[in-house]
Amino acid sequence: MLDGELFRQGRLEMSSAPLPEFQTPAEWNNLLPNKIAIVLSVVLVLVYLKDIIRLIPPLLYALDRKRGGESLEYNVSAARMRNTVALIYTLPFCLIADYCGAYRPGFWSMVPPEWSSAATLGVMLAYFLLRRLCYAAIRPGKMSAESLATLKHSLYNYFIALVSVAVPTIGILPLFSVREDIISTVFLALTGLAFAFATVRAWQILKSRRSPLPTILYLCGLEILPAAAVVASAVLL
């Protein structure tokens, strides 16, 4: 029966109906929510551009010197400026992370592509909230308020440096037809390097007031635990 339908008078009969066209996923930068978020990021950076430029000298000093973070915290206006810039940079960081596919757990398939960046921002805010809770629950003793603020905000310094480097780097690589997997690897490497530097600086701050074992325990509870929770959710969920 089947052969009779396929072959008639010694010829292969094929349907003349056109094959259905498969829709390809929309380009990341063509999704409307991403366009809006990109424009918002640019507007925020332009609005605070003067503050960002003023922050460069104390930020570089804080990154270069072991006690540079303390001097930045003593400068109240610079510290507030740093915190504001770190908050502003959260949006472009999440946009780059989503563009590179840096966070893709199993349940991410349920997230519509147009809301993937917003979901990534939610994960980032959850990380900051968990880190804040860790600092509220685990307070190292024998530390002044200024020293604790230096420890808590040290990550912000490296986060700002990371975004300042990652934005132009990830923006330029596609112009040279670099593969997406390589771009993602570069972003993950930059992020890991920035977190490693921030962890080392936190170690130095804690070690100056603690013996090695308590330093390791505090470091794990305050910095490594929140980051490990994000990595574990990406791998296990």
Predicted regions and their residues:
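Alpha-helical transmembrane segments
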Residues: 29-46, 113-127, 180-189
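Alpha-helical transmembrane segments with an aromatic anchor "belt"
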Residues: 102-175
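Hydrophobic alpha-helical transmembrane segments of multi-pass integral membrane proteins
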Residues: 41, 82-100, 126, 130, ...
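Cytoplasmic membrane-interface regions of multi-pass membrane proteins
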Residues: 54-70, 136-147, 203-204
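Hydrophobic alpha-helical segments and helix pairs
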Residues: 68-121
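Membrane-interface segments at loop-to-transmembrane junctions
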Residues: 71-78, 146-155, 213-219
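N-terminal juxtamembrane cytosolic/stromal segments of multi-pass membrane proteins
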Residues: 1-83, 94
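Terminal transmembrane helical module of multi-pass membrane proteins
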Residues: 165-237
